[in-house]
């Protein structure tokens, strides 16, 4: 989100063990208060975060070690931190419009791509891939926002109602997302595409390879936001 520079913090890869840790971090009052101010500076009132789980990798090459990432031509978004991450893994990141990804996989223009399970299944990307690798490199967060001007004009009572409604919606959406991910995994497995869970050694190698990215993000975002989000993970 180039219009909210501090949201670059969400591009820090491989720092969470599970979704519970992600949600605990973004809901943490210290972190939330600081990132909320960044949204306000850009004209938004941040109410909370939902998510679609983690981003994972789909590929036609079996990944069983860190070295297996080497040389894979993977489609990414046009995001400098994403490009830096996959390059650090030894892959060949290739920015591409999402509308071209399915054909790119079909025609072997690219070897792999990365997205949350919901996107992989709803767009049938798994049909062109032999493996889905649970890299879980980034949480796929969804910002629940309204215009700051709109929010500020609301009576205090209505602001409280909006916040309460967001809390209910956030919890519901998280539960629905978890259930949906389980269904999407089942769909992928039934198709014959294999899901790979990485071992601890490979995960640690990915973290180690990300050290320079953590430093780049540290230099780009508010120090308080960085510390509250990263903790001692870097």
Language model regions located:
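N-terminal secretory/targeting leader peptides
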Residues: 1-21, 30-31, 35-234
